[in-house]
């Protein structure tokens, strides 16, 4: 029997992919003699079979016979956590606690509308988890604990948030032994290290400042490197993910961390997140020399006006050059963009799309684009919340997982799922299919970038409008899921096929056919190219093109090895 079970939304069967927050809290309880256990979504099977997934999850939780069940919540899985908590409460009757970012922000609304959730714990829990959980186990819950939200005489009581932990070095090391014994333990991935917390910036679409109060904190360089050494000694970890929204804010501490990393007795690699205006060539050199291999950068918009409106305030001059410099150091770069801001114009979407195409042409840049969502705890949500309307369907936050099965929750409790709420503008309506267009762009990158050159840069959005018009027959089939639309268009992209008579039509046709068929030989379709030609970035278009050259038929296979390096294999057939 376990006294506490923490349920997490981790969807990969690897204990080193587990959320650090619940692991830390479980570690603290375990060190105090309270048996704790982690159960992740990954251990419940595939959510594609939602009924089986839910039944397995509830069964595994109940098998532990816990006295308390705590659910770690994010916006992408709140509906699933609520549905599972309802079933667990019905079977066990034990106290149900919600925590994590989503529950934290809508704690009052959750307790007002969801009777089977007993408590919500807000803020940093390292100093409050033991006092509250131990009192609850004794049957005498301490309702004075900071960060606790609970019901009393029909009212919702919200205690003051816990004070932020000033010295993050005092937080204990995670004990991964609390994870299930049957969970795989692959340390050869980005082993997570909580290096710090908080972002001092105030972007209107982001809720990070709500959690941490815009207070930037970083563990000491010595502690960060000690965690790397410890996890190498215990688990053989060599590749690390530095978990922090803005790791590079304090350049002096970052440089000292890099100096100590280089003194480790093993070759360590790591990745982090940053702002472009918080890195320069000197810092890039230092980080790359110390093992940095991947960096995540939120750019969000290519419009100077929108940069100001969303309070991101990035200077866009030099963005391409800075990212080109990162690539010159053999670093992997992921950039994030948002489209569909309430005040955004078609010209500003074109500016963003133009910047995206420029970055893609650099090669080696991964691009993410997200539809603007109105999340509680953000300034944008506060400004527009009275003008939002429920629009349950596909969301960038959830995809389609559990949406149909949790329809009653969405219908009855719209305040809990604001990412399904829509602020309607003419442009946001026009951009409904933009994610499908972007999927086609990224999967046929070379072809789409070539076609983009046929449009004026300041009206690049017209390329999207033409894509929608040519593929309208698929996009207007309401019964199709987004994934089904993507698959059909990938099989028969009428936008690409509309460029008949283009000088590069033969190459476009070959590239399209190879991407569609993946293995040209299996379809009996031979490309018309007469030389071995790379027609698109290898990391995205990896099929098996067969090319006719003077020496005969050759099979050329492009693939990525386990370190992310491009490999080319040529075999005579």
Regions found by a protein language model. Give the residues of each.
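Acidic, low-complexity/disordered tracts enriched in E/D and polar residues
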Residues: 482-572
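Structural motif
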Residues: 3, 67-68, 119, 239-241
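Glycine-rich beta-alpha loop elements in corrinoid/cobalamin-binding modules
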Residues: 28, 37-164, 377
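A short, glycine/small-residue-rich beta-strand->loop->alpha-helix junction that serves as a flexible
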Residues: 11-20, 73-78
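C-terminal accessory regions of radical SAM enzymes
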Residues: 4-14, 149-152, 347-496
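Radical SAM [4Fe-4S] cluster-binding motif and immediate context
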Residues: 169-334, 339-341, 354
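Residue-level recognition of beta-strand->loop/alpha-helix junctions
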Residues: 8, 38-45, 72, 210, ...
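Structural recognition of alpha->loop->beta junctions
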Residues: 110-127, 289-294, 354-369
